[in-house]
Amino acid sequence: MKNNKISGFQWAMTIFVFFVITMALSIMLRDFQSIIGVKHFIFEVTDLAPLIAAIICILVFKYKKVQLAGLKFSISLKVIERLLLALILPLIILIIGMYSFNTFADSFILLQSTGLSVPITHILIGHILMAFVVEFGFRSYLQNIVETKMNTFFASIVVGLMYSVFSANTTYGTEFAAYNFLYTFSFSMILGELIRATKGRTIYIATTFHASMTFGLIFLFSEEIGDLFSIKVIAISTAIVAVGYIGLSLIIRGIAYLTTRRNLEELEPNNYLDHVNDDEETNHTEAEKSSSNIKDAEKTGVATASTVGVAKNDTENTVADEPSIHEGTEKTEPQHHIGNQTESNHDEDHDITSESVESAESVKQAPQSDDLTNDSNEDEIEQSLKEPVTYKEDRRSSVVIDAEKHIEKTEEQSSDKNK
């Protein structure tokens, strides 16, 4: 796994802030239900809380790209496959529930026959909107954040617990609240498995499953009005389907892994072995980077010292060639001139060599772990590498010019003597 995720502190703070804002807003928005005049089984105003909390977290915290990784709206073959499952699984749950009602209660309740006073299209649109705003916050945003440090299964458990607390209903007693908690947790676990390995394309799948479940339950069961048997049947049916679907998915992936011998990362991108050594890998990467910087600086220092030695040898060889040029013309005055010039060359060479060595030593003694210091050291090293080469070229050209001038002067003197 690539370590391009958010830090552990921001990860924990994002989850905490999202949950606190969601719960606080759900309490504050309850009073607006009666103000807007919309019935709660059409659109629940408190469901806006996860959407608002997600937007606030995106604006407040950094690493926007990581936070928005679960909010992709593109379509793939896997998304189409999961969309079909998002329609089939609610149908299976409703069939199990209706069969249970017919077996244990002799009938199931149709709310439409007991006084729904709004068109079905209004209910459908309202439930699609509710599903979108809730799943935008919990699945497309929160689950994506949690999965940066956990695998999909455990991330679904964490998000499922938070979603169950958010959806808790204590109005009709403790037993009703317990079965409602089981229902919402199983509901969330199914959704977590449905959006697994979709690479951020979660909103279509989550919205379809959520809207299908709530829309069907409104017409077939009376849990909305506090019927204990209804919520019990719904909770147990959803839990059975959740266990069966997740278990079957794990078995299929296990068989595929054993038979094809594919890499576990290829088979399941966010698997159980991910995120185990995230902190260790990060520390190891930083240590390797620091040691490589130290080695590079040491090698550069050695290269600078060797370059200084080469420059010194080139200068000595250039100076040593000067007597042979001057001996061809005159033996007295040129030798005296060459001697003085050699002494000055050695003095200048000594100065340049000492300066280059000092620059190499300063590079070795500079802090190796700081990236900004390494950049400045590299500039100094490049400058020190350029100075000996430039000096060598300047000295060669100056020696040639002096030799040409001396030859011309000697020729003039010899011509004067001949005259």
From Swiss-Prot:
<feature type="transmembrane region" description="Helical">
    <location>
        <begin position="231"/>
        <end position="251"/>
    </location>
</feature>
<keyword id="KW-0472">Membrane</keyword>
<feature type="transmembrane region" description="Helical">
    <location>
        <begin position="175"/>
        <end position="195"/>
    </location>
</feature>
<dbReference type="Pfam" id="PF02517">
    <property type="entry name" value="Rce1-like"/>
</dbReference>
<feature type="compositionally biased region" description="Basic and acidic residues">
    <location>
        <begin position="282"/>
        <end position="299"/>
    </location>
</feature>
<keyword id="KW-0134">Cell wall</keyword>
<protein>
    <recommendedName>
        <fullName>Lysostaphin resistance protein A</fullName>
    </recommendedName>
</protein>
<dbReference type="GO" id="GO:0080120">
    <property type="term" value="P:CAAX-box protein maturation"/>
</dbReference>
<keyword id="KW-0812">Transmembrane</keyword>
<feature type="compositionally biased region" description="Acidic residues">
    <location>
        <begin position="372"/>
        <end position="382"/>
    </location>
</feature>
<comment type="function">
    <text>Involved in bacterial cell envelope homeostasis. Regulates peptidoglycan processing by N-acetylglucosaminidase SagB, perhaps acting as a scaffold protein. Pleiotropic regulator of gene expression, probably acting via interactions with multiple two-component systems. Plays a role in the abundant deposition of the immunoglobulin G-binding protein A (spa) at the cross-wall, a subcellular structure that initially arises from cytokinesis.</text>
</comment>
<dbReference type="GO" id="GO:0005886">
    <property type="term" value="C:plasma membrane"/>
</dbReference>
<feature type="transmembrane region" description="Helical">
    <location>
        <begin position="84"/>
        <end position="104"/>
    </location>
</feature>
<feature type="transmembrane region" description="Helical">
    <location>
        <begin position="153"/>
        <end position="173"/>
    </location>
</feature>
<feature type="region of interest" description="Disordered">
    <location>
        <begin position="273"/>
        <end position="419"/>
    </location>
</feature>
<feature type="transmembrane region" description="Helical">
    <location>
        <begin position="202"/>
        <end position="222"/>
    </location>
</feature>
<dbReference type="InterPro" id="IPR003675">
    <property type="entry name" value="Rce1/LyrA-like_dom"/>
</dbReference>
<feature type="transmembrane region" description="Helical">
    <location>
        <begin position="41"/>
        <end position="61"/>
    </location>
</feature>
<comment type="similarity">
    <text>Belongs to the LyrA family.</text>
</comment>
<feature type="transmembrane region" description="Helical">
    <location>
        <begin position="118"/>
        <end position="138"/>
    </location>
</feature>
<keyword id="KW-1133">Transmembrane helix</keyword>
<dbReference type="GO" id="GO:0004175">
    <property type="term" value="F:endopeptidase activity"/>
</dbReference>
<keyword id="KW-1003">Cell membrane</keyword>
<feature type="compositionally biased region" description="Basic and acidic residues">
    <location>
        <begin position="344"/>
        <end position="353"/>
    </location>
</feature>
<comment type="subunit">
    <text>Interacts with N-acetylglucosaminidase SagB; interaction is direct and facilitates peptidoglycan processing. Interacts (via N-terminal region including transmembrane domains) with sensor protein kinase WalK (via N-terminal region including transmembrane domains). Interacts (via N-terminal region including transmembrane domains) with sensor protein kinase SaeS. Interacts with other histidine kinases, perhaps via their transmembrane domains.</text>
</comment>
<keyword id="KW-0964">Secreted</keyword>
<feature type="compositionally biased region" description="Basic and acidic residues">
    <location>
        <begin position="323"/>
        <end position="336"/>
    </location>
</feature>
<feature type="transmembrane region" description="Helical">
    <location>
        <begin position="9"/>
        <end position="29"/>
    </location>
</feature>
<feature type="compositionally biased region" description="Basic and acidic residues">
    <location>
        <begin position="383"/>
        <end position="419"/>
    </location>
</feature>
